[in-house]
């Protein structure tokens, strides 16, 4: 510590604070200390980091660490009103509390707070890392918040962001879709179809469609391919396009993200599950009669906390050169929208 202090021209206490990422040390000084530490071959003691985490978890120390919980949704109240976001947050809070961290919530689209001001608030509160939750229709973070990602370790939940690309935790949508196909086939369905908005699929790099198509390839190698129905916006205005697709494709079970498809089928004269089955790609407790895949978004929230805490312990800050992805396996849930025997 003394050698680093001498090389950087600061006190040993400043070195200690800088290497812990303390907000009490300016970003410029912290960077200088880190350069000197690296030049002198300094490495962090992983055992000490684990000890501090355990002390925070058990309450044996009064250290009160805090993470920022950043609402990236355009709706300020999405954390309370959206059907799935509260599940991510519940998992994140549970894991953060276990590790001794509090969560302070901020809205990224608040017109009264610039990126620079938010960064200043995080420093003042001693916040050293951030969780980004709420990206649903885009994988782009607000440009005016660029300084946040450049200074603080941050992990996104649900989707992989672009420009910048940050580390993220999310459901494994490819294996989810393939597993759903496997389950449908094992039950007895032989003509599974997919109802999905291409905007959503593009957001997750086509992983839902990829899993579905590989399922077709594996289980229907000689059968005619059933093309996904993607005209969601049009069907919401006029069901004729959906009805035409059903008549043409003749699916016996549908995979989808949209509960309204149940109403569409009823209006088209189908009895569920007698005439056709329904499997939800994102099963929700609010519609527990559906069969589907529980994405375990609570575990995604937990994984995001683990990832950002690991980054803090290892002194990782800023936009990563090699972002890390943590994917959570989904769980099959039985329901009344399918019938045994297909």
Segments the model singles out, each with a brief description of its role:
Residues 180-219, 318-339:
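An alpha-beta-alpha
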Residues 68-69, 126-135, 155, 191-198, ...:
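Periplasmic-binding protein-like
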Residues 93-109, 164, 192-195, 206-239, ...:
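Short beta-strand elements in bilobed, periplasmic/extracellular small-molecule ligand-binding domains
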Residues 1-57:
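N-terminal helix-turn-helix DNA-binding module of bacterial transcription factors
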Residues 133-176, 280-291:
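Flexible loop/hinge segments that line or gate small-molecule binding clefts
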Residues 167-194, 235-243, 295-316:
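Hydrophobic alpha-helical segments within soluble ligand-binding/sensing domains
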Residues 2, 40-119, 128, 198, ...:
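Amphipathic helical "hinge" segments at domain boundaries
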Residues 244-342:
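Flexible loop/turn connectors
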């Amino acid at each position: 510590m003394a050698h680093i202090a001498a090389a950087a021209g600061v006190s040993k206490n400043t070195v200690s604070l800088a290497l812990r990422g303390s907000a009490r040390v300016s970003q410029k000084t912290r960077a200088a200390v880190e350069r000197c530490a690296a030049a002198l071959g300094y490495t962090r003691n992983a055992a000490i980091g684990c000890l501090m985490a355990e002390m925070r978890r058990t309450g044996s120390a009064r250290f009160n660490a805090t993470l920022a919980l950043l609402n990236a949704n355009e709706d300020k109240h999405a954390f309370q009103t959206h059907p799935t976001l509260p599940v991510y947050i519940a998992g994140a809070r549970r894991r953060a509390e276990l590790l001794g961290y509090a969560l302070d919530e901020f809205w990224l689209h608040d017109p009264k707070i610039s990126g620079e001001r938010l960064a200043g608030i995080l420093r003042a509160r001693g916040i050293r890392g951030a969780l980004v939750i709420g990206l649903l229709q885009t994988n782009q973070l607000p440009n005016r918040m660029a300084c946040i990602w450049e200074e603080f370790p941050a992990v996104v939940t649900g989707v992989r962001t672009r420009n910048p690309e940050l580390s993220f935790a999310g459901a494994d949508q490819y294996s989810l879709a393939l597993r759903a196909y496997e389950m449908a086939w094992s039950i007895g369905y032989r003509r599974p179809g997919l109802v999905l908005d291409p905007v959503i699929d593009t957001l997750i790099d086509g992983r839902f469609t990829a899993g579905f198509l590989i399922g077709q390839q594996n289980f229907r190698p000689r059968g005619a391919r059933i093309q996904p129905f993607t005209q969601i916006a049009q069907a919401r205005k006029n069901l004729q396009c959906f009805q035409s697709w059903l008549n043409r494709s003749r699916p016996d079970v549908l995979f989808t993200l949209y509960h309204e498809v149940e109403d569409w089928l009823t209006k088209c004269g189908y009895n569920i599950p007698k005439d056709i089955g329904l499997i939800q790609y994102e099963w929700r407790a609010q519609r527990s009669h559906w069969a589907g895949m529980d994405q375990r978004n609570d575990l995604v929230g937990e994984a995001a906390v683990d990832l950002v805490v690991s980054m803090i312990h290892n002194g990782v800050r800023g936009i990563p050169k090699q972002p890390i992805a943590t994917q959570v396996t989904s769980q099959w849930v039985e329901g009344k929208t399918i019938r045994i025997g297909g």
